[in-house]
Regions:
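C-terminal and inter-domain tail/linker signature
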Residues: 1-155
């Protein structure tokens, strides 16, 4: 099924609105049933709408005041890339590490692929060392926790 530019932008705006509202179910509903969320800083891959929903829900626990400002977005074919700044406060556990209460303002880039009237996948990049420095997480502990999470998820 060919997805038009207008349809892609409608799906994308619905998704962004859901993320900003911390509505993990609505954010995940914009994905194809076999959609994938790739979190490159940790190496974690979430496959299927339920796993994607849980990923969003976990991020809202880790950073309950999480938000983002999109500086720019570019759509080419069936792929949209946007970049900006992720903001929030480390008020909840992150990868099992205790909250620090420290704020973050983290530059990010995300690429979103579309297929059959939905998001086929999203890939998120940011610098983990920058997150650790801002939030006060020990980098080595985050690396170890990421490795353990990948092992548990079979990624």
């Amino acid at each position: 099924m060919v997805v038009t530019r207008d349809e892609i932008m409608r799906i994308y705006r619905t998704h962004v609105d859901a993320e900003l509202a911390h509505d993990s179910a609505r954010a995940a509903s914009t994905y194809c049933p076999d959609g994938t969320y790739r979190h490159m800083p940790t190496g974690l891959v979430f496959k299927g709408c339920e796993a994607v929903r849980l990923q969003y829900a976990m991020s809202y626990v880790s950073f309950p005041d999480q938000g983002f400002d999109i500086a720019r977005e570019v759509l080419d074919g069936d792929t949209l890339v946007h970049w900006g700044t992720l903001t929030g406060t480390a008020k909840g556990a992150f990868l099992g590490l205790p909250p620090t209460g420290r704020p973050i303002a983290l530059p990010f880039v995300a690429a979103i692929e579309f297929r059959d009237g939905a998001m086929a996948g999203e890939t998120l990049w940011y610098d983990m060392l920058t997150l650790c420095e801002q939030a006060g997480y020990p980098f080595e502990a985050v690396q170890q926790a990421s490795s353990e999470a990948r092992r548990r998820l079979g990624a």
